[in-house]
């Protein structure tokens, strides 16, 4: 459907009739306010909420690594690249933004890949009062540094032979695998970062 005016044709007389009534081609843009063209500012409450949620995810991941270093990894220290947990938390928030329950419907399985073998570290349920709608599998990767193997070799021969003296260095790369639990076709998204 097309809206039409009272003009019956587009002849020069009709155009002059428009101009006589005060229509000027440039005036159409002047009728709109400049701010109508600007992208709206994000809601400050949403930004604060997202930042708070991101920080709590960072803490959950750091606690998971801290808990696992003695129990599952058998090392005394885990060195994490700067802002790695921050990047992971932002990606988790991005992947959960399209889900029906958002982050609340997420169950995250945290693993560590060491020499092509995945070791399970923890299972994080974001909100136990919500039925999970998707799973995220986070795979940390060990840094492949030759100097750490040398250091471990030399320190294991002397008084530092305790298994808990070992330092694990994480790579800045990680993998996130998203699996929708409610989808009939079983949509899986794999992101390598």
From Swiss-Prot:
The name on file for this protein is: DNA damage-inducible transcript 4-like protein
Pfam families linked to this entry: RTP801_C (PF07809)
According to its UniProt entry, the function of this protein is described as: Inhibits cell growth by regulating the TOR signaling pathway upstream of the TSC1-TSC2 complex and downstream of AKT1.
Q: Which gene encodes it?
A: DDIT4L
Task: State the Gene3D superfamilies in the record.
Answer: RTP801-like
Gene Ontology biological-process annotations: negative regulation of signal transduction
Q: Which domain of life is it from?
A: Eukaryota
- This protein's major location comes to cytoplasm
Source organism phylogeny: Eukaryota, Metazoa, Chordata, Craniata, Vertebrata
Under the cellular component aspect of Gene Ontology, which terms does the record hold? cytoplasm
Instruction: Spell out the family assignment given in the record's similarity comment.
Output: Belongs to the DDIT4 family.
- Tell me which InterPro entries the record gives: RTP801-like, RTP801-like_C_sf
Compartments where located: Cytoplasm
Q: Which UniProt keywords are present, listed alphabetically?
A: Cytoplasm
